[in-house]
Amino acid sequence: KFRPERTLAAMQSYIGLVESGDAALTILPETAWTIPFERTPPALAQRLDAHVGKGHAVAIGLPAFTLEQKRGLRDDWRLTNSVLLLQPGGAADRYASAPRYDKHHLVPFGEFIPWGFAWFVNLMQIPMGDFGRGATIQAPFAVGGQRIAFNICYEDLFGEEIRAVLLEGSGASILANVSNIAWFGRSHALPQHLQIARMRSLETGRPMLRATNTGMTAAIDAGGKVIAQLEPYTVGALDVSVQGTSGLTPFTRLGNLPILLLAIAALALALIAPRRSGPSSA
């Protein structure tokens, strides 16, 4: 889909799925758009704007331009791996006023180039291999009375950082993950990633919505149970109703502190016990 001849077809397919639904919020996967939004063909942008104008919000995974400020150097424009929220109301130019989430945890070689390895990225012809990095904590999106905290791809591995978002300001009532894991094919990575998302919901007591291009697209309740999902590698839209939650779970309040204290206590006991037992006498 990163090839120019496939970009337009992919965008048309996604817009068709968006127009076929009547959801308050439609979430498209990571890099559903393989070009920045301002380069969307006018006819497709008008179709999307018409749908949003009817009262529907749309979140799109795409690369976005970000002005990166460099100390002592000239500012530079870089791409970020982002989620853009188009929503009803506001400015006439929805894009100009659209909130955005920029991915913070970047994948080596795929999203940033480790020092000294530019030659490898060039050799492998990896598309968009050097993204800018988003802030650690970013404000959730306000949609329909809910506050939705987005993360991208494997960022949902980091429970402590999702916890930090819930503790910041008004927190979030729903979690959302957008992913493009086509790179892993039909491997165990798909169900494993879903299990990771379920754990984040269980830890935080928040439902999670997952939009992926190959699987697993799913809705997870606040108890970590999958309430609906699409079959992997099928074209379609998952239509679900999700109610956000509030309040703080023990994990959200304390994080990994209890398990760290238990680990330290167990290690201390393991070191002390042999000394206390001492040599046995016949």
Identify what each model region corresponds to.
Residues 1-282:
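Enzyme catalytic cores with a strong preference for nitrogen-chemistry domains
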